Amino acid sequence: MDDERGKLAVYPGTFDPLTMGHVSLIRRGRQIFDRVIVAVAMDTPKTPLFSLDERVRMAEEVFADHEGITVEPFSGLLVDYAERRGANVILRGLRAVSDFEYEFQLALMNRKLKRHVQTVFLMTDYQWLYISSTIIKAAASLGGDIKGLVPDNVYRRLREKYGYPYPLNPGLALSTEADEDLPPSL
């Protein structure tokens, strides 16, 4: 095996948007591998909130000062992309047992397609276990404050997408008149 190949890992995803869970895993992956490519998926069955260019740009901004971490768009089969880039490792994160079955199936299929490409799993840091891009978008779209759960540049972009400032939570009364009929709080 070529000595350089074991030093490069590909971390794929849609990153719509990039979360602090992703950032943590990428940084930890960089501690293991000489280089990590953050591979932003062009082809996705999901309808992204952010365009491919926006997702790539946001990730580039986050990792601009991180030596050994690069961001690239990719399309097609991940194992083909990894092979073209000279990587024999796909880096994946696991949040919970529920992630394992799907990730295990993907790893087996990738291994079947390209035997020399290995999948390495890292457990997500405990403080990010409940975070996913889908949950972040849902909370932000309803006015939830997701500051600290995504990088600052992503936070600003989400505010732009959903309106600045975030809209009030529609479940809250806009007037205190409705509260007058309620018993006082304990």
Swiss-Prot record:
E.C. numbers: 2.7.7.3
Major place of residence: cytoplasm
Binding-site residues, substrate: T14, K46, L78, R92
Enzyme class: transferase
A GO biological process held by the record: coenzyme A biosynthetic process
SUPFAM superfamilies: Nucleotidylyl transferase (SSF52374)
Names of the cofactor(s): Mg(2+)
InterPro entries: Cyt_trans-like, PPAT, Rossmann-like_a/b/a_fold
PANTHER family hit by this protein: PHOSPHOPANTETHEINE ADENYLYLTRANSFERASE (PTHR21342:SF1)
Function text: Reversibly transfers an adenylyl group from ATP to 4'-phosphopantetheine, yielding dephospho-CoA (dPCoA) and pyrophosphate.
Protein name: Phosphopantetheine adenylyltransferase
Organism: Nitratidesulfovibrio vulgaris (strain ATCC 29579 / DSM 644 / CCUG 34227 / NCIMB 8303 / VKM B-1760 / Hildenborough) (Desulfovibrio vulgaris)
